[in-house]
């Protein structure tokens, strides 16, 4: 059990059968009702962000999340196969659990898969990945005065905004958390 006074960003807790990670929290004192802790939490199953207020001194169950290094192997219908890097055991993850992550996955990419017991909670991608631009319109010199952006499609079909000088076939660095262009590779 974890007391609300021990809350910190990144802590995983279980509330009403749901598993949350604390995104941020704020202690606030009121004259009559005592201290309250306002938290912003992400549900690890649904990915929704929720705000929950706890009373000071409340205790919640700590959720132990195991992070295991895996390698993405291939897609098989609506499932995607990953291999444990230590035991070589293969697991299948349903497409619905990793819809956003599919925009950046490619064969042999090393990721971390989060487990709550035997349940797969999510996939952690590296923060930045080098990916190839499959299609973009050519930029014309003198098009703009400022740093204008254009659309570029990655191999997965994911659309990212890139500067005008990026061409089809170039490798770029993409921030997987925000899904944005960082720089040329």
Curated annotation (Swiss-Prot):
One GO CC term on file: cytoplasm
SMART domains: EFP, Elong-fact-P_C
CDD domains per record: S1_EF-P_repeat_1
The keyword Zinc-finger is assigned to this record: no
Protein location: Cytoplasm
HAMAP family in the cross-refs: EF_P
Protein name: Elongation factor P
Organism, as annotated: Acholeplasma laidlawii (strain PG-8A)
Name of the gene this protein is made from: efp
């Amino acid at each position: 059990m974890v007391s609300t006074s021990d809350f910190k960003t990144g802590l995983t807790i279980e509330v009403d059968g749901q598993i949350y990670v604390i995104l941020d929290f704020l202690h606030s004192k009121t004259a009559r009702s005592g201290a309250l802790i306002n938290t912003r939490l992400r549900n690890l199953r649904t990915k929704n962000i929720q705000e929950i207020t706890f009373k000071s001194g409340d205790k919640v169950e700590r959720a132990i999340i195991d992070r295991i290094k895996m390698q993405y192997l291939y897609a098989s219908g609506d499932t995607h196969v990953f291999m444990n890097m230590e035991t070589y055991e293969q697991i299948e993850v349903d497409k619905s659990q990793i819809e956003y992550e599919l925009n950046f996955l490619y064969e042999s990419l090393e990721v971390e898969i989060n487990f709550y017991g035997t349940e797969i909670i999510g996939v952690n991608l590296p923060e930045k990945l080098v990916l190839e631009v499959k299609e973009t319109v050519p930029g014309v010199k003198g098009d703009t005065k400022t740093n204008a952006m254009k659309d570029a499609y990655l191999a997965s079909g994911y659309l990212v905004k890139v500067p005008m000088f990026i061409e089809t076939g170039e490798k770029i660095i993409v921030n997987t958390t925000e899904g944005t262009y960082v720089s040329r590779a």
